[in-house]
Amino acid sequence: MKKRITYSLLALLAVVAFAFTDSSKAKAAEALPLYYLQITGITSDGNDFAWDNLTSSQTKAPNVLKGNKLYVKARFMGYTKLTVITGKDGKNLLYNGTAKMFKSDAILGQNKVVIGWDKYFEIPMDALQDNSIQIKALSSGTTFVYSQKIDFERE
């Protein structure tokens, strides 16, 4: 008899818990392919990591960059399959481990659905082709989306 009452109470508890579950807290949606990519910040290890914010129309870093490591913040809107930062040898610095993504922050849209990412990259300046940086990312199929190219002066 005790077992029957225990099972009945557990079943009732499960029904009540299910009935009061708020399904609006977590939403899943099909990810949009990458449609926007912008470099939004730049700094270096010799600049005490003081970020210069960049707009989409800027093509030059406002301050001279010092040190050996370049730090870039980029905004990715939509889902990306592959990110490319090209080095002197024409190869992807992220793939070969020369550069690395060290942080990412989700960008939330309506109903707390992730719609993009702010990603932070560390790149050795000597590995770049010249004193400039541009990021490209694979959106869907074979379509690449490009950020603006940012030139910088180096001390």
From Swiss-Prot:
The keyword Magnesium does not apply. The keyword Signal applies. This is SPbeta prophage-derived uncharacterized protein YolA. Residues 1-28 form the signal peptide. It holds the Pfam family DUF4879. Keywords: Signal. The gene is yolA. It comes from Bacillus subtilis (strain 168). The lineage of its organism: Bacteria, Bacillati, Bacillota, Bacilli, Bacillales. InterPro entries: DUF4879 (IPR032624).
